[in-house]
Amino acid sequence: MSTQLSRFFQNRSWLDAIVTVYGADIDLGNRKAWQKVSRQNAAFARIHDKTYISVTSNFKRILNYSNLRKKFAKKGLWCWWSYLQHGLGFLGLVAPISVAQGFDKVLFASTDEYVYGLPWGSHPTVDGLTQWSNTEVMTECDNWTRLEKIRYIVRLRQPVSLRSCWRDETGGNCCVCRACIVDVASLLTEDANPSAYGYLFDGITPESTLAIFKPGTVMFKSHADEPDYHQWLAVQEILRGKLGKGADFGKFQRFAVKIAQLRLEDYFVDLPPRWQT
């Protein structure tokens, strides 16, 4: 979500509409979560005087990802959705909408995989060259890391609810998975209150979420995790610097200390030599 928001704020003067897809990160069977996310996105669009468009699609359900993985994993395609489908899949859903609405530009959210030169299902050399009718696809922030995008959003001083979690079935953030934890830590590097950005920690303490880092637990498995790994390294460096200067993160103090102290190399299957620090 940080990607979409950073791009929105940079280009909002000419954007006419915001499109959200039901059936991508939220399964078609989870209507309750979709309604929550859709309401939030519609409210965001309304505040910024933009049209809100929602699309419902079974473009993930029609594929057997297990069979695709069995067939193509040996060729490096461990996840069909991530490595191949999602870029052109999203653009394919937006294409008929853009023609019907008369839009001549589509702004497509980037991912930080570009920065590390990894094979990925969304890339400027593919997305940015995709055209139909009189519509062109624009890609920006392609060289920004996820941490840089979060930093940009925080410095706008307009707190919004981010959604980085794929595990929470209510449409929010579980605050206990790797994706949530690293984004909470990223917000702390900018002295931002994670609760103001949608990380609510209902009924749990921030430091208790780090229980997922147990001896022998594998957190980083393949080169597809490289962007996450580098985000963790950058976050740790900043937090260590702040803590060394006596920073006080309030109820997140223990959380920040534990994040800064983690030995990330302990959570790899095999730490690639070029990742070693």
Task: Mark where each language-model region is.
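Nucleotide-activated chemistry modules centered on ATP-dependent adenylation/adenylyltransferase
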Residues: 2-277
